[in-house]
């Protein structure tokens, strides 16, 4: 069965030629950080908002180096306290379909810590789908060889974040696997229920950036406990906080060491007054140390 690209034509272009050109243009503006990037944190808003930022993540995916891409994204539409896997064989994009690695999803399910998503749950969620066109574009010459492992991450306790980190760490250590963590950063404004503004000496948009960059610095430290404390203290509305935390626990349980770096940051708009709103997009990479 196929997961249809339900957000094409609204969140991003559904015309293959135009979409490919758009992605190519954005990728040409970005610069690769390192040949050894093993994981990225990339945004998942509509491409008119975050498409350019995502290029700074995906320029670091070298498809020739990998056989499968794990994608961890938050669940926006269904409340779940666990992680969900897809039963579908293929996920569609306008520029080429991506096959699911069923052997891997079955092995993950057999751990007893995952559930199966329904087709409608898969198709309603945008955080995973918004990563697919970029993967398909970057891997356009290897679409038949590359597979994906989409994982929908629910609202996890710290203990479960750690558990999933331990489960997934051996997969991260496998040199054939690349990990994508899907997350936007601060959602600021009354419509998001978040209007924290403590440093009145700077404009609101600058305060938001300070807040986000503090979070990104903690992610760079690789400490999931400190990241949890930061979220508890600031209540920053990072929608992919659980996938990010799982990724930090993965690196904690990895047999290798990783350098975590911030690559790019922007906001959908500059908040000047309290009635304004914005969403932030931060891009980070996890690079294996030699």
From Swiss-Prot:
It holds the Pfam family Memo. The keyword Coiled coil applies. Residues 12-39 form a coiled coil. Keywords: Coiled coil. Belongs to the MEMO1 family. PANTHER family: PROTEIN MEMO1 (PTHR11060:SF0). This is Protein MEMO1 homolog. It comes from Dictyostelium discoideum (Social amoeba). The gene is memo1.
